[in-house]
Amino acid sequence: MIQMQTNLDVADNSGARRVMCIKVLGGSKRKYAGVGDIIVVSVKEAIPRGRVKKGDVMKAVVVRTAKDIKRADGSVIRFDSNAAVLINNQAEPIGTRIFGPVPRELRARNQMKIISLAPEVL
């Protein structure tokens, strides 16, 4: 469950290391984002010579949350940290690699490019 001012790790090689959520997209009064939702983020920490730099405002897809994800079969999945993948305006990932596992709920949200780049889908 991601809301404004939440800090997230970046799970790709775009050059950003940490980002902060500044808006949850999808409705004027929407407060929280979950896995697969698109948010607007500000880059708070970046590596030198990366594709993005500190202070950039970008869109991102939430790929991992510490909050439980409940599945239809009754199972629950949760991650140790909150993480996102930076995307461009065409909803394509900026990085060419994804780090760490991603949940299969992204498939239902039409994030197939992220699913195909991920090393493990849970």
Swiss-Prot record:
SUPFAM superfamilies: Ribosomal protein L14 (SSF50193). GO terms for molecular function: large ribosomal subunit rRNA binding; structural constituent of ribosome. One of its GO terms (biological process) is translation. The keyword Ribonucleoprotein applies. PROSITE patterns: RIBOSOMAL_L14. InterPro entries: Ribosomal_uL14, Ribosomal_uL14_bac-type, Ribosomal_uL14_CS, Ribosomal_uL14_sf. GO terms for cellular component: cytosolic large ribosomal subunit. Keywords: Ribonucleoprotein, Ribosomal protein, RNA-binding, rRNA-binding. Part of the 50S ribosomal subunit. Forms a cluster with proteins L3 and L19. In the 70S ribosome, L14 and L19 interact and together make contacts with the 16S rRNA in bridges B5 and B8. Belongs to the universal ribosomal protein uL14 family. Binds to 23S rRNA. Forms part of two intersubunit bridges in the 70S ribosome. This is Large ribosomal subunit protein uL14.
